[in-house]
Design a protein with these regions (language model features):
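Active-site mouth of glycoside hydrolases
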Residues: 2-228
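Structural recognition of the beta-strand scaffold that forms the well-ordered cores
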Residues: 11-15, 48-53, 112-115, 164-168, ...
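Active-site clefts of carbohydrate-active enzymes
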Residues: 18, 170-182, 235-245, 255-294, ...
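Alpha-helical scaffolding within the catalytic cores
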Residues: 33-37, 148-154, 211-224, 250-261, ...
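Glycoside hydrolase catalytic-domain groove-lining segments
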Residues: 183-187, 191, 198-281, 314, ...
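Aromatic-rich peripheral "rim/lid" segments of glycoside hydrolase catalytic domains that contact
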Residues: 310-369
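Aromatic-Pro/Gly-enriched surface loop or interdomain linker
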Residues: 343-414
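A conserved amphipathic helix/loop scaffold
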Residues: 423-582
Length: 582
């Protein structure tokens, strides 16, 4: 399969801009400097580079106007040559530099992921002069020239062995042009992807995206698999998990959480294409190296395929935009501006030595014994809630798959439906499938937030007299733990045929277990996962109660068994089956 050009052995890669000229490297091209970069990256154990032929340099079109409209698109004031490159609006000079770059990469045995429409980089838009101020993702004229560029570029370089994948471009959803209709991005990315496939059907198309929603929004997980062969995540601590120190559970597990969510919902392999510490106000160099080591091992264990650090070399000394705009970092390379290695380099070398001892340099898939059902994406679910559910499961010695509730419900011994906050969380057909699986022996856990499910009395064995908005903290007493949970609603129980497992401080029942056919339904009237998703220190502080006792109850009921466990809440395990016997 052509995906195996990238997805196979676990890889460690890096996002590359030249050490001397960074984003300006194609204009101020210095092959000797690039070779010096390659030498130190090779010695550091890097095998994969993500590279960026800057759109504004490789297709440097200028619109030359007559009295009222564009008369022609030229190269500066000059006419485009009547050649394949010229007709595509592509700079022959830039392509020759790219050719030399690829030849050098081949010499050092680097594998290249090429970002094709690199119009967004480090929070700056790079567009050919002709298209400045245009809607880059939806203007028909712009897309026409993008297609010409892609077709010419891919056709010209498709025979270069070092290239193993075509990236749509760096975080292309951040380019202007989405407008009010999120489907504009689907049309744009599908159009670009189809053009790539026409010219080269031997390499995977990679999304290059940083962040995705579930179903709503322009670059959502549900449609990514229709456009691309491989999906990506860019999980930066300062944007998603900034409340916790880098080397703690939440920032580290955010990588496999995001990969699992992306892969399970999109249906295509998903890897960590960008991540980093983002500079030394966020951490020290030693902390950065410790973070990198933890992320490597965690990503390997959870089947994340590979990781690529942002970025190769420090850039904080550069004085042109966007670097002069950037006050959050830019000094986040593997190497400093003088090509001196940081402690992170030694961690990469040590990891690659360990990896070489594993047959095939990849672990067997880790076993999964539960499913997290994602409520319908109508604005009622957050990544914080899903991440908290994922982490509670890890603490309970469970590994989960993610499934979107409106889809066909797959078999699983345990279903986790966390913090329901939407009145349309699951369609009736899917819900009936789910309950049938419970009647046949599965375990279902539902925790309530503001959403309503009409069948709750029938499937939980409880009668709810009323609910009241209280916006207060309720403390659950369960398994020797006192577990405070912030809740918007209180549910007053009128009667119960279910087993009451826990009450709050007012002696109001809040946690129930009800036999349903051969299976069981657990119901919690409090939004445990939503609370922990935003609770400071929830997966960090030693004095935080052990909320995972709830999920351990679910694991025990569902018969989840592992060959090993650990009492420490932040030291977790994965289980990998080599064969039927081991």
């Amino acid at each position: 399969m052509f995906k195996q050009k990238l997805i196979g052995k676990f890889f460690t890669g890096i996002n590359y801009w030249g050490s001397e000229n960074a984003i300006n490297m194609w204009e101020d091209f210095d092959i000797k400097s690039i070779e010096n970069d390659f030498k130190v990256m090779k010695d550091a154990g890097i095998t994969h580079l993500r590279i960026f032929p800057l759109w504004s340099v490789f297709q440097p079109l200028k619109a030359l106007y007559g009295p009222s409209e564009v008369y022609e698109y030229g190269f500066g004031e000059g006419k485009r040559p009547d050649t394949p490159a010229g007709r595509a609006g592509v700079s022959e000079d830039a392509c020759e530099k790219f050719e030399a770059f690829c030849a050098l990469a081949d010499k050092y045995d680097f594998k290249l992921v090429v970002g094709l429409i690199t119009g967004h980089m480090s929070f700056r838009t790079y567009t050919p002069p002709a298209f400045e101020g245009k809607e880059l993702l939806s203007d028909p004229t712009v897309i026409k020239w993008q297609l010409r560029f892609v077709k010419y570029f891919v056709t010209r370089f498709r025979d270069i062995d070092a290239i193993i994948g075509w990236d749509l471009g760096n975080e292309t959803c951040n380019m202007p042009g989405l407008g009010s209709n999120p489907d504009a991005y689907y049309v744009w990315s599908s159009t670009i992807a189809d053009a790539i496939r026409v010219c080269d059907g031997t390499r995977p198309i990679i999304s290059g995206l940083d962040y995705s929603t579930i179903e709503n929004g322009p670059n959502n997980y549900k449609t990514i698999g229709e456009m691309c062969d491989i999906h990506t995540v860019h999980p930066y601590n300062i944007f998603q998990t900034e409340a916790d120190p880098l080397t703690t559970m939440k920032p580290i597990l955010d990588l496999p959480f995001r990969c699992a969510l992306g892969e399970d919902i999109s249906g295509v392999p998903t890897f960590v294409q960008e991540f980093g510490s983002i500079g030394y106000m966020n951490c020290s160099r030693r902390t950065e190296a410790d973070f990198y080591r933890c992320c490597l091992l965690t990503s390997l264990a959870h089947g994340c395929h590979g990781v690529m650090w942002w970025c190769a070399f420090d850039q904080g000394h550069l004085t042109y935009a966007p670097y002069r705009w950037n006050t959050i970092g830019s000094d986040y390379g593997f190497f400093d501006k003088n090509l001196e290695p940081k402690p992170i380099v030694e961690e990469n070398i040590r990891f690659k030595e360990r990896l070489s001892l594993i047959p095939g340099e990849v672990l067997p898939p880790h076993t999964k014994n539960a499913g997290v059902l994602i409520p319908r994406d109508d604005g009622g679910i957050t990544m914080d809630t899903l991440r908290a559910s994922y982490m509670l499961a890890k603490q309970a010695n469970l590994d989960v798959t993610f499934k979107y509730a409106p889809d066909t419900i797959p078999d699983s011994p345990l279903y986790i439906f966390p913090s329901i906050s939407s009145h349309k969380s699951i369609p009736a057909e899917s819900f009936n499938q789910l309950i049938d699986k419970v009647r046949n022996g599965a375990v279902l856990y539902i925790s309530a937030d503001s959403g309503l499910i009409r069948s709750i009395p029938e499937i939980t064995g409880i009668s709810i007299a009323y609910r009241e908005r209280i916006n207060a903290v309720r403390t659950i007493s369960f398994d020797g733990q006192k577990l405070p949970v912030n809740t918007e609603y209180m549910y007053k129980i009128e009667s119960s045929d279910a087993e009451i497992l826990a009450t709050d401080e007012t002696n109001e029942p809040v946690f129930f277990k009800y036999r349903l056919g051969k299976g069981a339904v657990y119901f919690l009237t409090l939004p445990l996962e939503k609370h922990l998703g935003t609770q400071l220190g929830a997966f960090l502080k030693d004095d935080i109660p052990n909320y995972s006792v709830k999920y351990r109850e679910l694991a025990a009921e569902s018969g989840a068994e592992r060959v090993a466990d650990c009492e420490n809440r932040v030291i977790r395990l994965t289980e990998h089956r080599v064969d039927e016997n081991s």
